[in-house]
Design a protein with these regions (language model features):
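Short, acidic Gly/Pro/Ser/Thr-rich loop/turn segments
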Residues: 19, 60-62, 111-113
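Catalytic-core segments of class I nucleotidyltransferases/pyrophosphorylases
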Residues: 32-102, 118-123
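Short, solvent-exposed polar/charged micro-motifs at secondary-structure junctions
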Residues: 21-23, 103-108
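Conserved beta-loop-beta/alpha segment of the NTase-like Rossmann-fold superfamily
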Residues: 1-29
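Short beta-strand-to-turn element immediately C-terminal to the catalytic PLP-Schiff-base lysine
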Residues: 26-28, 54-55, 106-107
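Short, basic/aromatic-enriched C-terminal tail that caps enzymatic domains
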Residues: 107-123
Length: 123
């Protein structure tokens, strides 16, 4: 989906399906990322970040340069919020919604068991 996207800078987003570690995303009518949060009540979310992105070299460079300038004052700044900073201030990051992607983040064996039972059947 991202490879075929017309956007040079895009993030894959799905409808909210998970119950752990979500990053909710908000985007405008042009599909440009405008906000993200782990708290779904903090924004008008349109989906959930999967963690797969297509970034141009120039976007990635700006992101790395900006992150380097922020690390001293914001040492726990996650890449999700760095993507948001760049999208808001420098270059738009477009949201590509895919309703057919079924996924699950696996952090431990318990997650793996859950994924095998509930997600693998869609593969």
């Amino acid at each position: 989906v991202l490879i075929d996207s017309k956007y040079k800078n895009a993030m894959l987003v799905t409808p909210v399906r998970k119950f752990q570690d979500q990053y909710y995303v908000e985007y405008d009518r042009n599909d440009v990322l405008t906000n993200c949060s782990t708290n779904k009540n903090a924004l008008h979310y349109g989906g959930e970040m999967v963690g797969i992105h297509k970034l141009s070299r120039s976007f990635f460079r700006k992101m790395c340069e900006d992150y380097a300038s922020q690390i001293q004052t914001s040492p726990k700044l996650g890449y999700e919020f760095e993507l948001l900073r760049i999208s808001r201030m420098m270059m738009p990051l477009h949201v590509v919604m895919d309703n057919d992607v079924h996924w699950y983040e696996i952090d431990d064996e318990k997650d793996l068991i859950f994924a095998k039972k509930h997600v693998a059947k869609y593969c």
